[in-house]
């Protein structure tokens, strides 16, 4: 129905119409399904040319072709994603375990490799229903944010029979709107949930002294508490929403014989994939980056924004964040007054 030549002709006509410079654009492949079009460009500059400034070109192309959506990706990004997925599969397969959830995760990685251009979690889970483990195989660290919520949804869908736990140091780190998300999600998924009360006064005090960035200390403390919960309850896997530890680092054996599984990273997931799945669960989304404590630290000690920006850039380099998403997050720091 659609050819490379047709798409290139339409894109060039739109670029000329809106006054964009004429450029040579190279398309590697196109894929069409369910009134959605995937355009795979040879490289990122070709991708940028098709999207246009502010998404203007691809928006007009979608209107002109009467499509529900158009996805523009570079072939190099897919090569990188395919490589990471193969490493994830190899790492998970090397684990000497008969855990139901890990077996189902490997099947999902295989499916994503087979449908690398068009894999969609909604469609995948509507077409594939997995048996759930009789035993609780995973503890999911649930903060109420998008990444941890996505991780809990996946853990449930993949049959880990998870329990969700939330470390609660108070509203300066875990505000009430996040608790509302937690309640909504665990009820929707029918997942058992527990709060772990914690004293983070030292982390908060050090943060307000300007001596440390709070995220590292907070993450470390939370990890220890979730680890201890899993150990006390003899649950073999702890799941986090980390997007950076991809490939061979997606799952690691801890000193206490627990496995730490970074579920989004294991599937080389980007933010748009996460948002697409969690929008089915009526969760609130929040603009900006981080918790109220981080907001106050940025406000009181502007130099601390540098370390938050470094985190955003790491996620961008890994492909977890698109440059436009990263720019929005960084720009939000300028609204802190």
Protein language model features and the residues they cover:
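N-proximal, solvent-exposed amphipathic alpha-helical segments enriched in charged/polar residues
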Residues: 1-29
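Short, surface-exposed ligand-recognition loops at beta-strand->loop->(often short) alpha-helix junctions
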Residues: 1-6, 45-48, 142
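A short interface-forming secondary-structure element
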Residues: 33-56
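Charge-rich, low-aromatic oligomerization/scaffolding segments with amphipathic character
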Residues: 48-63, 90-94
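A short amphipathic beta-strand at an alpha->beta junction
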Residues: 62-87
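Nucleotide-activated chemistry modules centered on ATP-dependent adenylation/adenylyltransferase
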Residues: 78-141, 149-337
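Walker A (P-loop) phosphate-binding loop of P-loop NTPases
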Residues: 145
């Amino acid at each position: 129905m659609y050819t490379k030549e047709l798409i290139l002709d339409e894109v060039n006509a739109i670029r000329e119409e809106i006054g964009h410079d004429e450029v040579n654009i190279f398309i590697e492949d196109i894929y069409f399904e369910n009134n959605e079009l995937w355009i795979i460009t040879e490289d990122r500059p070709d991708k940028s040319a098709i999207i246009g400034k502010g998404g203007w070109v691809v928006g007009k192309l979608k209107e002109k072709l009467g499509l529900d959506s158009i996805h523009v990706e570079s072939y190099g990004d897919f090569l990188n994603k395919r490589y990471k997925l193969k490493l994830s599969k190899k790492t998970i397969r090397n684990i000497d375990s008969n855990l139901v959830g890990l077996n189902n995760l490997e099947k999902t990685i295989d499916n994503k490799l087979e449908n690398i251009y068009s894999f969609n979690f909604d469609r995948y889970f509507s077409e594939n229903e997995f048996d759930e483990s009789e035993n609780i195989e995973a503890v999911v660290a649930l903060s109420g944010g998008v990444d941890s919520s996505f991780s809990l949804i996946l853990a449930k869908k993949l049959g880990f029979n998870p329990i969700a736990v939330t470390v609660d140091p108070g509203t300066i780190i875990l505000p009430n709107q996040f608790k509302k998300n937690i309640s909504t999600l665990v009820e929707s998924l029918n997942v058992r949930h527990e709060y772990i009360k914690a004293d983070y006064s030292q982390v908060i005090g050090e943060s307000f002294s300007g001596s440390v960035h709070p995220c590292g200390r907070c993450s470390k403390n939370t990890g220890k508490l979730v680890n201890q919960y899993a150990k006390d309850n003899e649950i073999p896997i702890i799941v986090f929403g980390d997007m950076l530890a991809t490939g061979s680092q997606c799952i690691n054996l801890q000193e206490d014989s627990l496995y730490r599984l970074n579920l989004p990273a294991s599937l080389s997931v980007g933010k748009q994939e996460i948002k697409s799945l969690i929008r089915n669960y009526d969760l609130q989304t929040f603009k900006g980056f981080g918790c109220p404590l981080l907001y106050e630290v940025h406000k009181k000690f502007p130099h601390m924004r540098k370390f938050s920006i470094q985190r955003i850039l790491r996620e961008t380099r890994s492909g977890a964040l698109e440059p436009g998403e990263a720019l929005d997050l960084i720009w939000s720091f300028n609204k802190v007054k």
